[in-house]
């Protein structure tokens, strides 16, 4: 088959990760258009076909070969015991660029203080297998029931405790729940079907995708700064710039001046630019970075 006819089947997570995933792909250079009620986004790449599916099911379908590649959480790979290639760690979630946690929670008023106190108790969760393994590791015999959602409202009437995912802890606190322990820290992963990974064309396509997605994540919260400065001010400027890497210094037509370019975290720029100006920099301008590839 010629490369012109080859297509990589991509599974995108539907639900809480959908918007942040579409945004991440856009920053990486892949632009999806998702129509209302449609599970088949269009994309500006003729070599890709995408389908939206729940992250909980993604690893299973990638293992079966329904998708060549997909995005899901480390948690769901473990929960479904899927045999897939873990291509890249993509540390982002619904509302932030950090991992999520699966935590054991009880009502604030509960007398339960540790996992040992759950002997003979009832636990509700979406991650039944992860929870059962955790209890077994602690030698605790408790009932674990699958929860179809709204897990946080189940204690104390419908469950003694829950195992629930949290990003910030805000929802747990709002429901007056107290965290006893963390079972698992999880982040999004790019995964591939093992047979697809052995196909040279598909593997290169997947590896290129991984590189661009990681570059987009690495660029998060960072900007570039360019400026001109007299050589006499260079030492002082270098002491001010908190660079992720050494600044790039280029010669200018005027032998007494140089151009500097540097990547910094965006949150410090409002303080940094006035300091650079006072130290002798001129023509300072800031630009956004879509991808930062090591």
From Swiss-Prot:
Read off the InterPro entries from this record: ATP-PRT_HisG_long (IPR020621), ATP_PRibTrfase_cat (IPR013820), ATP_PRibTrfase_HisG (IPR001348), HisG_C (IPR013115), N-reg_PII-like_a/b (IPR011322), N-reg_PII/ATP_PRibTrfase_C (IPR015867)
Question: Where found, per UniProt?
Answer: Cytoplasm
- Source organism of this protein record: Chlorobium chlorochromatii (strain CaD3)
An example GO biological process term is: L-histidine biosynthetic process
Gene (UniProt): hisG
Q: Which UniProt keywords apply?
A: Amino-acid biosynthesis, ATP-binding, Cytoplasm, Glycosyltransferase, Histidine biosynthesis, Magnesium, Metal-binding, Nucleotide-binding, Transferase
Write out the pathway annotation from the protein's UniProt entry.
Answer: Amino-acid biosynthesis; L-histidine biosynthesis; L-histidine from 5-phospho-alpha-D-ribose 1-diphosphate: step 1/9
A single GO cellular-component term from the record reads:
cytoplasm
SUPFAM superfamilies, alphabetized: GlnB-like, Periplasmic binding protein-like II
Task: Kindly list the GO molecular function terms attached to this UniProt entry.
Answer: ATP binding; ATP phosphoribosyltransferase activity; magnesium ion binding
Q: What class of enzyme is it?
A: transferase
Which reaction is catalysed here?
1-(5-phospho-beta-D-ribosyl)-ATP + diphosphate = 5-phospho-alpha-D-ribose 1-diphosphate + ATP
Mechanisms controlling activity: Feedback inhibited by histidine.
Q: What is its EC number?
A: 2.4.2.17
Name what cofactor the protein needs.
Mg(2+)
Q: Does the keyword Amino-acid biosynthesis apply?
A: yes
Q: Report the sequence similarity comment from the record.
A: Belongs to the ATP phosphoribosyltransferase family. Long subfamily.
Q: What's the protein here called?
A: ATP phosphoribosyltransferase
Where this protein primarily resides, as one coarse class?
cytoplasm
- Give one Pfam family, short name only: HisG_C
Task of the protein: Catalyzes the condensation of ATP and 5-phosphoribose 1-diphosphate to form N'-(5'-phosphoribosyl)-ATP (PR-ATP). Has a crucial role in the pathway because the rate of histidine biosynthesis seems to be controlled primarily by regulation of HisG enzymatic activity.
